[in-house]
């Protein structure tokens, strides 16, 4: 068999700019090099790994009030907590600095960009990636968030120039072809949000499916796509709810699922799980963690009581205290999230 390294050597001698390597040895990665938690165990569990991937794109889709921006801030705060660099492109001009600080974001070390157009957004992301990787170490975590891709108009729109049908999708598709490879080689987590769009469903019965700007282009480039939908509100006073339940649906993922060659039963699409979202603080970590532990049978439930191993049973409202008493609960949760959906 011919030596593939000899082919690489000849390419280098010819001054080729083509990124190429043999197998896993090189800058091109087939799998993420790490993960940044969303601080919502339910979402991490849906992803199948302990957070959004470093070296890939994550897409969060949801209407106004579905918690996308809060989850973005959680990811940025988590990246900073691990010593990484956080960057946010605020295309809608709705970044709330007080809320970001409340959720743990270090504003003194947060890079904020506010592009005027969609073209500026993508050009800025590419420039930030190159600048950040040059300024930071090779192993430093970098998380870039675009909130949202639907918030920035195209340059022609700002000048009231008539555009071709689907011009935004064409631009997004072209830019994502470049960005998906760039974030992969630079080990960067790129998180993008988008909003659902109405589509006329002529000649069909029932509720039309959910669609969003850049659906095909971003969906193809993303390692993980999650749809967030607001459900029933909760609170002691129905007239003044303090939060609502969020239904999270895993539309697609390329980083989790069954790896058994002969298995034909496991699915990695359309997983749906619900978590509590408080308007003041975002996803409730403790109830979300308990739900994941219960689903994986690490914690048993009977008659309103939860039980972990041989410890004394407890109520759901006592779980936050029990995590302090039983540190192994967090270790168990961490093992579940590292292992994905399957035992």
Locate predicted features.
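Phosphate-binding/switch region of NTP-binding enzymes
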Residues: 165-296
């Amino acid at each position: 068999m011919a030596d593939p390294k000899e082919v690489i050597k000849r390419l280098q001698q010819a001054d080729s700019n083509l990124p190429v390597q043999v197998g896993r040895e090189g800058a091109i990665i087939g799998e993420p090099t790490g993960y940044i938690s969303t601080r919502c165990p339910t979402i991490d569990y849906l992803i199948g790994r302990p957070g959004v991937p470093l070296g890939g794109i994550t897409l969060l889709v949801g209407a106004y009030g579905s918690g996308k921006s809060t989850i973005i801030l959680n990811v940025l705060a988590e990246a900073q907590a691990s010593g990484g660099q956080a960057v946010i492109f605020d295309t809608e001009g709705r970044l709330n600095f007080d809320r970001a600080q409340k959720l743990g974001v270090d504003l003194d070390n947060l890079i904020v960009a506010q592009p005027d157009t969609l073209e500026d957004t993508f050009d800025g992301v590419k420039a930030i990636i190159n600048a950040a990787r040059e300024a930071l170490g090779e192993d430093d975590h970098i998380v870039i968030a675009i909130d949202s891709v639907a918030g920035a108009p195209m340059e022609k729109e700002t000048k009231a120039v008539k555009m071709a049908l689907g011009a935004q999708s064409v631009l997004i598709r072209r830019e994502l072809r470049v960005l998906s490879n760039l974030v992969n080689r630079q080990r960067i987590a790129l998180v993008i949000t988008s909003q659902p769009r109405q589509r006329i469903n002529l000649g069909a019965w029932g509720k039309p499916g959910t669609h969003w700007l850049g659906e095909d282009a971003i969906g193809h480039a993303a390692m993980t796509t999650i749809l967030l939908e607001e459900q029933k509100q909760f609170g002691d006073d129905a007239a003044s709810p303090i939060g609502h339940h969020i239904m999270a649906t895993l539309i697609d993922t390329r980083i989790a699922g069954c790896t058994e060659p002969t298995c034909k039963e496991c699915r990695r699409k359309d997983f749906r799980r619900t978590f509590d979202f408080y308007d003041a603080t975002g996803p409730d970590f403790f109830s979300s963690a308990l739900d994941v532990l219960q689903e994986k049978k690490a914690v048993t439930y009977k008659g309103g009581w939860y039980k972990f191993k041989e410890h004394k049973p407890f109520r759901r409202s006592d779980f936050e205290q029990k995590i302090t008493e039983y540190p192994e609960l967090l270790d168990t949760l961490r093992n579940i999230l590292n292992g994905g959906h399957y035992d």
